[in-house]
């Protein structure tokens, strides 16, 4: 009978260039989520994993433990999550996924967004949504009710994964992208069946794709060639389309969609309040590079949701599919529905 895992044994395994099994990873993350791991043990684990490179089995084990310890979210899983890993080299990219989620909901897609406060970025989804008037202090039951009432809700990681608080200080002090950046998009407590996920670190794309593939989930996983965890407008992006256990790769040039190039500076935010103000202007219909990149990423979410219902869409060119979805997203903004959706959502969380 194998001996029970210990922290020295697991960290030694990683230092020696070997990897953890699913069960060892589950044990370690369970220790973290229950507050039974010391900061030194957690820091050692995170750095050793970062140095050795995480595997799909390790991420699956960590994810299983996080969801096992999560508070339940009683919601229809036929929904969409648009999310990014964070950890891009700029550390200050506009909260594109948050506003794209509002636009997708305004276009009629049920959205269950999952996120947290900034750890490896200046402004996390929770930070900017709070600035936009969304109350994150509501109960898990109310989170589900808000979805049924408005078509969009937010699963604040600190609420549904209270064990994450045990890792917050270590993550903040390390100041680097860690396995938690990969875990976040995989640990939505509602387990929505469609995901649009941006990954900043190219070496971690196979992890994200591999986990979605083993789950039989539907997802568009993407990365800008400029290193941001979004579909970018500064140049090309790469997309990994996951459907029914198969993966199809695409190269996307936004020029194919009629979207002009933008400098990276146009996609960067300056802080929580400034990002919130940019989002308000985008939802009000202001043209420019911020609008362009938001519509493109909203389109990815809309396409992921449609792919969930119709897997044969993989046979169509990605550029054509996204061009159609950009038009739908633009209409949701220009009609005023997206701005109204944000106000409706925020009001529901405060009711």
UniProtKB/Swiss-Prot annotation:
Where on the tree of life does the source sit, at the highest rank?
Answer: Bacteria
Self-association and partners: Homodimer.
What terms describe the molecular function in GO for this protein? anthranilate phosphoribosyltransferase activity; magnesium ion binding
Name the needed cofactors.
Answer: Mg(2+)
Q: Which residues form a coiled coil?
A: none
Binding-site positions, anthranilate 2: 171
Q: What is the protein name for this chain?
A: Anthranilate phosphoribosyltransferase
List the keywords (alphabetical): Amino-acid biosynthesis, Aromatic amino acid biosynthesis, Glycosyltransferase, Magnesium, Metal-binding, Transferase, Tryptophan biosynthesis
Protein family: Belongs to the anthranilate phosphoribosyltransferase family.
Looking up InterPro entries in the UniProt record yields: Anthranilate_Pribosyl_Tfrase, Glycosyl_Trfase_fam3, Glycosyl_Trfase_fam3_N_dom, Glycosyl_Trfase_fam3_N_dom_sf, Nuc_phospho_transferase
* Single biological process term from Gene Ontology: L-tryptophan biosynthetic process
Q: What is its EC number?
A: 2.4.2.18
Q: Pfam families this protein is in? A: Glycos_trans_3N (PF02885), Glycos_transf_3 (PF00591)
Q: Where does 5-phospho-alpha-D-ribose 1-diphosphate bind?
A: 84, 87-88, 95-98, 113-121, 125
User: Which organism is the protein's source?
Assistant: Clavibacter michiganensis subsp. michiganensis (strain NCPPB 382)
Q: Does the keyword Zinc apply?
A: no
User: What is one GO cellular-component annotation here?
Assistant: cytosol
